[in-house]
From Swiss-Prot:
GO molecular function: methionyl-tRNA formyltransferase activity
Presence of the UniProt keyword Chaperone in the record: no
Keywords, comma-separated and alphabetical: Protein biosynthesis, Transferase
Organism, scientific name: Geobacter sulfurreducens (strain ATCC 51573 / DSM 12127 / PCA)
NCBIfam families: fmt
Recorded GO CC terms: cytosol
Protein name per UniProt: Methionyl-tRNA formyltransferase
Family membership: Belongs to the Fmt family.
Catalysed transformations (reactions): L-methionyl-tRNA(fMet) + (6R)-10-formyltetrahydrofolate = N-formyl-L-methionyl-tRNA(fMet) + (6S)-5,6,7,8-tetrahydrofolate + H(+)
Amino acid sequence: MAGLRIIFMGTPEFACPTLRKLIERGEEVIAVVTQPDRPKGRGQKLVPPPVKALAQEHDIPVLQPLKVRTPESVDEIRRLAPDLIVVVAFGQILPQSLLDIPKHGCINIHASLLPRYRGAAPLNWCLINGETETGITTMMMDAGLDTGDMLVKRAIPIGPDEDAQSLHDRLSQLGAETIDETLDLLLAGKLVREKQDDSLTCYAPMLKKEDGLVDWTREPVQVKNQVRGFTPWPGAYTFLDGKTLKLYRVAVAGETGEPGEILRVGREGILVGCGSGSILIQELQLEGRKRLPTAEFLAGFRLEPGTRLGEAGSVEH
């Protein structure tokens, strides 16, 4: 039996397991719509999005409109006559004229338990806010931002030391499993739509680099969660002698000291005063150097207790 005629819309690595799942299921993926190739690295060479590379491996036609909302792009998608559009981390807002094209609508895979954490960076904000559970929601798309009817929800626990990279990888796989379940229900005529309760929502805006600056007056658990949510990108950071110091792995500690003051330096890490306690820095990266476990970093860098971490150009000794 021929599968559904599906257009897949997605861009980063996060979206790839779902596209693979659609191919494995035998659905007829008639096109992939993804963002344009972007210049990367020192040579500014154009690099295709991961979804484009995967589509080309399977000889699936690829469309890369600068703006999918233009009448030309919408008409091109209309001519393909899809039964369904599946969207995962595409990176552009779809106009109503596009949402109306497929007979089964447009299904989005969102990396949170809606209606909580609508927006561009749900898995990061779950970590920053210290949540212990998140998941995947499939939803029927409407013209709002992650406001459509919910279809299938799958929840997973968040580990106490889990960072955004680890959670990204797990949710990416869970997204593929959830679309599998969603399409089975759709084909069986058993898909149930549930309205979102707007009173329960919270927003997860795109991360900005400057949001990663550590405020050492905050409580240790808040700083730890900030580091978890910002690892690996854009990175939580402070300053050491005017240079950016990125923090990739930290632990909460009980000793107290002045906010931002290095209290102790040892193989187990760098202990820094923070709020009503302290933070043990276990993995870091100083500007111009590689990301390293703290013990390896200290083997080639002398750091004295009493040094103050803080804003650029205002480092105290």
